[in-house]
Structures are given as C-alpha cells and as structure tokens.
Amino acid sequence: MNRWLLPEDITDVMPAEACKVESLRRAVLDLYQSYGYELVAPPILEFLDSLLTGTGSDLNLQTFKLVDQLSGRTLGLRADMTPQVARIDAHLLNRADVTRLCYAGSVAHARTPVGSSAREELQLGAEIYGCATWEADLEAITLLLKTLSVAGLEKVYLDLSHAGILAGILDGQSLDKETIEALYGLLQSKDRPRLGEWSTCLPENVAKALVALIELNGPCAEVLAKAKKELPKHAAIDKALADLERLVSAAANLSANVELSIDLADLRGYQYHSGVMFAAYVDRLPQPIARGGRYDHVGQAFGRPRPATGFSLDLLTLANLSPLNVRKMAITAPWVEDAELSKAIAALRDKGEVVIQVLAGTTLEAAEYQCDRELVKQGSSWEVKKK
C-alpha cells in the first residue's frame, strides 16, 4: 500500500486553495463580528453521548467513534458543530438574554454525504439563541446572504419550508421512528405514486395532505395561497404558514439578486428543526450550499431549553465556487547580509506587504504569489521597483 494514499473522499487542501479558504474565513468571521456574533471553538472530540445529545439518528451514523484510552468511554469525532455550540450556550455561557455565536472548524463524516464527494468539511456557521420571534430568523437569513455575497456569489436561490406543517399533518398519528424516516424519504424524492401507496394506511385527510406537499413548491405567493386551500385546518399548520408569509414579506427586500421560493416537501432535518427552515442554492451546485432554520428544542437536551435559529455551510465548497481572486501580490528580495536590506524588508512586512527572499542558488516557485515588484539597491538604500 502506498504511504501517500488518503482514505476515500478525504483530500489535502493545496496552497492556492488554502489561501482562498483562509481569506474567506477571515472575511466572513469579521462580517459576523460586525453583527455582534462571538466566536467559539468547541473541541473536535467529545464523549459520544454528549456529542449526540438532542440530535437525530443521521448524526449518529455519520460520527466516527473511538475509545478514550484514559476513561474507557466512547468518544465521537464531530460530524456537526451545531449541537456543540448549543451545548456551550445552554451549559457553559448560561446567559438569560440573546446570545449570538459563530464558529468555524473541521468536521468529519463516517459516510460520504449524499450529493457530496468529501467526508471532511470546514464547517462555518452562526446561531442566535434566546429569541423566538421571526426577526431572529430574518437576521440568520440576512447573514447567510451576506456570507455568500462576501464570497462573490451574488445570484442566490433561497428555498423556504417549515417543520410545523408536517408536525400538524401528522398530529394524532402514532408513527414510529422508522416510518417517519420512510415518509421523509418519499417527500424528499417527491415520489408521488409511492407516497400515495404508502399513505393508504393513514386517514384519508392525512394521506391527501401528504401527497399535496409534493406539489406545494414554487413562487412564494402561489404556494402559500395553494397551501391555505389544500392543507387541513390545524393550529400548527396555520402558524407555520403565517410564519412563512411574514418572513417572505420581510425577506423580499433583502437583495435584488435573491430569488425566493417555497418547497414544503423539503424537510431535510425535520426531526431536528422546529420551525422555519431554509436552504440556499447557487449556480453550478445541485445541492444546497447552505442550510439553516429554527431548532428550539436542542438546548432542552442540555437541561436548558432556549429558542435558537441559525445556519451552516462548508467553507471548502464556498471557496471552490467563489469567483474571487485572492492571489496575493508580493515583493522579491535577494538573500544577502545587509543591515539596510533587513530594515527595508521588516518595514514592508509591518505595512502588510508580502516580501519573499530568494535563497541563494534557488528560483522562486511560489505559485500562489504574484511577484510584481522587487527590492533593488539604489546607492546605499533599498527601494521597491516594478519588475
């Protein structure tokens, strides 16, 4: 076996890409800070029971597991940072008021996620805790759109959904976990014939509503009007539609480059979310570049229920799609023993310039830098000249 081989769907990030990723990471985290978000850095390893608290079975399947040599307990290599950040808010910070947290760190998946070609991601996200109103959802969506704008992705397609609609339709039905997951799969695939067959064991009004969800996607106004007519009257459904209507009205003016739509069958993470859900799509990527929504019940697993909303995305994917050119301009300098040269180089670096000293007997091959200037000795001083 070749020693340089990596596990399947695990890759190295090369210099030019790493430079772009880091540039975006800094810019995005600075953006979040300007909105009042505080950066947290949870550990990449945790005890498994803590790591999976308040999450669904999908995360358990995606988590690498190993035994702690000190305690003998099972550890998990995180596959999602969101539960960790919820733990920090609920258990460690323990604040009564609104808390805004952001994060950026590596996550690993035991299985390659559907629609992806990588089992390792650089997850970046932002969460708002302590606010149960639609304004927090709007802020999360606004910040997501700003994130994509920072990366140079101006044309965005934003899909909205709501976990409360399916909860209202299934209210009073005794369905086990496996049945719910099967239903979720049929809704995601929009397989109307199979869903019709599957739902024959349910009351007629429930079966009819489930099948209707598949067709409830498209322009916001049309979908909302159709949903009010075709979905059953239920407090949870009425509230969900009202939430979406209010959010659509507020989000319509966020950006002229954002196309809003609703897809009530897009319920990925249904067991995790408790309210508004959203997914952002961009050109050249068939799956969402970012997902988010409300998940008010997660903090309850840590003994302190707190309303929460937010989003996350893979920074590596964002960098790959970003049209921005972050290749840095640089200055070359010879490697000679000269006190004045050393002072000149130090002064330039203090100003933020990249100065690369070319070692004796070598040629410069730093492809990620464009060396357009050089330090040249003029009399007794060193000056920057264009090449």
Swiss-Prot record:
Pathway, per record: Amino-acid biosynthesis; L-histidine biosynthesis; L-histidine from 5-phospho-alpha-D-ribose 1-diphosphate: step 1/9
InterPro entries reported in the protein's UniProt record: aa-tRNA-synth_II/BPL/LPL, HisRS-like_core, HisRS/HisZ, HisZ
Gene3D superfamilies named among the record's database cross-references: Bira Bifunctional Protein, Domain 2 (3.30.930.10)
CC terms in the record's Gene Ontology section: cytoplasm
Signal peptide feature range: none
Record-linked CDD domains: HisRS-like_core (cd00773)
Keyword terms: Amino-acid biosynthesis, Cytoplasm, Histidine biosynthesis
A biological process term (GO) from this entry: L-histidine biosynthetic process
Domain of life, source organism: Bacteria
Subcellular location: Cytoplasm
Protein task: Required for the first step of histidine biosynthesis. May allow the feedback regulation of ATP phosphoribosyltransferase activity by histidine.
Family according to the record: Belongs to the class-II aminoacyl-tRNA synthetase family. HisZ subfamily.
Quaternary context: Heteromultimer composed of HisG and HisZ subunits.
Miscellaneous comment: This function is generally fulfilled by the C-terminal part of HisG, which is missing in some bacteria such as this one.
HAMAP family: HisZ (MF_00125)
Protein name: ATP phosphoribosyltransferase regulatory subunit
Species in which this protein is naturally found: Polynucleobacter necessarius subsp. necessarius (strain STIR1)
Gene: hisZ
